[in-house]
């Protein structure tokens, strides 16, 4: 494909991506407002691997939080 054809295709794709779907144009907004964002602890990365943690502690992941914790042992 020539560079002119690629530019034309890119332009058409850009226009298509910016069009609002017809189905959402005639729908009214739902009533009410969104509630405040729930309070969550900030994402903290105390460690990156077990070797950064002191002593026997391991680097444990809980969602986006990484922290050094004492290990548990399962029998």
UniProtKB/Swiss-Prot annotation:
Protein name: Notewaprin-b
Gene3D superfamilies found in the cross-reference section: Elafin-like (4.10.75.10)
Gene Ontology CC: extracellular region; extracellular space
Cited SMART domains: WAP
Family of this protein: Belongs to the venom waprin family.
GO MF term set: serine-type endopeptidase inhibitor activity
Pfam families, A to Z: WAP (PF00095)
Species of provenance: Notechis scutatus scutatus (Mainland tiger snake)
């Amino acid at each position: 494909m020539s560079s002119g054809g690629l530019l034309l295709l890119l332009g058409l794709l850009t226009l298509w991506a910016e069009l609002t779907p017809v189905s959402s144009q005639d729908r009214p907004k739902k009533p009410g407002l969104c509630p405040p964002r729930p309070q969550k602890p900030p994402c903290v990365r105390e460690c990156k691997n077990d070797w950064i943690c002191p002593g026997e502690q391991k680097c444990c992941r809980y969602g986006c939080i990484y922290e050094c914790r004492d290990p548990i042992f399962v029998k």
